[in-house]
C-alpha cells in the first residue's frame, strides 16, 4: 500500500455492475433465506477475458483496482461472511484481479472504503444514488456505458 493517496483508482461495484445478480432465478428469496448461491451463480455482465486484459493494462499503468460491494440487506454476521466469500470466489472464478476488496454493509457510503487512499477515484456502479453520492471523482453508469470502451479511453488518454 502506498503512503500517499493514489491518484489513479477505479472502484467497482459488483451486483448489477459486474455480475448479473438480478438475472439469477429467485435471487431475492434466496438472499432473504441467507443463501449465498446467487452471488456465486450470477453470470458476468461483460466479456471477462477482455475486461481482465484491460484491467491488467490499467494496473500496469499505475491504476489501483478496488471492489466496493454492498453485502446482503438485513443479514447475520455469518451470512455477511458467506457473502464476502461468495463474491471473492466469483471474482476468482472469472480471473478478475483487484488490489483491495471491500464487502461493506448494505447502504454504507462506498467512498468511506477508499477515502484515506484515494485522491481521485472513478466509481463504476449501476446504482444512481450511489453514483450521486460519490465525491471522489467521476462515475460510470454501466447500464448506459460500455465500461470496457470507457476504460480503454482512460488508457489512451494516458491518465
State the predicted function of each range.
Residues 1-5, 113-116:
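A short acidic-Thr-Gly-centered motif at the start of a beta-strand
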Residues 3, 9-93, 98:
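Alpha-helical substrate-recognition element adjacent to the catalytic core
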Residues 8-10, 120-121:
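The start of beta-strands in P-loop NTPase/AAA+ ATPase cores
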Residues 19-22, 74-78, 110-113, 130-133, ...:
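Short catalytic/ligand-binding loop motif for oxyanion handling, primarily in non-cytosolic enzymes
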Residues 68, 103-107, 142:
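Conserved beta-strand termini and adjacent loop/short-helix elements that scaffold enzyme active sites
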Residues 92-94, 109-112, 127:
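Metal-dependent phosphoesterase core characteristic of DEDDh/y 3'-5' exonuclease domains
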Residues 98-119:
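Donor nucleotide-activated moiety binding/catalytic core segment of transferases
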Residues 119-158:
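Acidic, Mg2+-coordinating phosphoryl-transfer loop and its flanking beta/alpha structural elements
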